[in-house]
Amino acid sequence: MLFDKQRWQEFAAGYSIFDCTIFDKHRFVCLSYEITDSPHRDPLPRMRLLLVRASRPLDAKRFVLNEYGNFGFARVSSNLTPMEFAAVDTSGHVFSYDAARAEEEPEHPRDLASSDLAGVVNQVVRIGQSIYTVGGPRRLHKRLGVGQWQDLSKNVPWPKDVATPGNGLKYMWRDASGFSESDIYVAGGEGDVMRFDGQKFSKVAFPSNELLHNVHCAGDGRVYIGGNMGSLYVGRENTWKKLAGGDFSVPWKDIAWFAGKLWCGSDYGLWTLEGDKLVRAQVPADVQLTSGVIDISPDGKHMLTAGPDGASLFDGKNWQVLFSRHDFE
């Protein structure tokens, strides 16, 4: 058991998981928010970043908790070289943790060259051996170190209508994934997909202008893109095919390739792609209740998934429910 009742009350009770990241089967991070009754997030609910070291004894040494009250919606990712995790919210607040430090950093860059607009961070991802942030309008940054972010989108094609009122979502990138750090796909906005070769961006001829939420460069050599209300596309460069219509009430939170198949996670659990058809994942019921966001360990051996009420771990053969709110509340 990852928690006992005492540690649950101390570290997790009253909080809902929003994102997660995994180093290996023994070390992972859950980003969660305080459960409140405020319909307008005013004041902001408190954010917790809980580092779990599952191989340690069930005492305070198993958990490292950091808590903040000034973060909006944040996402988190991790890296092994150096071993660290970083969380960034939509307004550019940054928290990072490594062996020597755990603290809030200077804000993530938000200024847009030759513009009065401010950038927004929507996602934090690991590509290759680096952490990247994705946002809008058309923003991609690579983490170089504490307080250091390389703006890769300086030379991205800049639409003439980006500042037109009502176009706030049109170029709002929401996700990025790469076969390598010189073959990255970025997606979001209204069918706004680009490929980055490590030096420059090129526009991808995508067949839809629907709002896009996810992109994943998969182990089968293809790129999968998740659209509005759970639609799914597959392709690469300028050739694409729609696999599934947007028949769900919510978009995917994450899509990922693991154990030879594509996994899609949402507020309602996990789906897998079988052939060219999306089906409800054949996993235990308690796993479905503790799934949604997805992260794959850097060595590719474990998949961590988490939902508001808990988290589960998969090694390609066996599932382990790490914890569930239903066991304690």
Model-derived features with residue positions:
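Residue-level hotspots at or immediately adjacent to binding/recognition sites across diverse folds
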Residues: M1-E329
